From Swiss-Prot:
Protein's UniProt name: Putative poly [ADP-ribose] polymerase-like 100L
Entry keyword set: Glycosyltransferase, NAD, Transferase
Alphabetized InterPro entries for the sequence: ARTD/PARP, Poly(ADP-ribose)pol_cat_dom
Originating organism: Invertebrate iridescent virus 6 (IIV-6)
UniProt catalytic activity: NAD(+) + (ADP-D-ribosyl)n-acceptor = nicotinamide + (ADP-D-ribosyl)n+1-acceptor + H(+)
């Protein structure tokens, strides 16, 4: 992790700080899926806004190997545990460790996947969160209006913000955080 850009260093340090405040024991591993590099770079090069962020994706341990083999899928196969799509079909991320830990299950080991996500021009949603009856955002409509992702702001019934990307080429894995109890 020595060759990080300053912004990426700040983001990973923020994640580490959150883990430490939760008194979590963890190890961070650097990961690179070469199959993600070219599509990710192409997606960014074709976008007006080049903005990316390091974001967290919580998943059960049983889903890690399939995700590493095939990448993070918007509609995963049945071999991967899949939960929620309150804001439409997409890959869901958070900037909050606690939010992402809620998706890791209750095993003694927990896994957080850290992705570089092209957020580009973000659609900011500040509406009321009403559980499974949430709004279904349409990626094609968002794209036609110049948006690349959705940032759902915390508040109005939602405790932590969420970021949704709608194209599998919008993200690439950078780190795996293994948490032990």
């Amino acid at each position: 992790m020595d060759n990080l850009k300053e912004e990426e260093t700040n983001e990973i340090n923020y994640i580490i700080d959150q883990l430490q405040k939760l008194n979590k024991k963890f190890k961070i591993y650097t990961v690179q899926r070469f199959k993600e590099e070219e599509p990710f770079n192409k997606y960014i090069s074709e976008s007006v806004s080049k903005k990316t962020r390091l974001l967290i994706h919580g998943t059960r341990c049983s889903s890690v190997i399939p995700i590493l083999q095939t990448g993070l899928k918007i509609r995963p196969s049945t071999s991967v545990h899949f939960s929620g799509k309150v804001y439409g079909e997409g890959n869901y991320f958070s900037e909050h460790v606690q939010k992402s830990l809620n998706y890791t299950g209750w095993d003694n080991d927990q896994i957080l996947l850290i992705y570089e996500v092209h957020v580009g021009n973000e659609y900011i949603y500040e509406g009321w969160y009403n559980g499974d009856r949430g709004i279904k955002l349409n990626y094609n409509e968002l794209l036609q209006n110049g948006y690349n992702s959705t940032y759902v702001k915390a508040g109005n019934g939602l405790q932590n913000s969420e970021i949704i990307s709608y194209n599998e080429d919008q993200s690439k894995i950078k780190y795996i955080i293994h948490i032990t109890k």
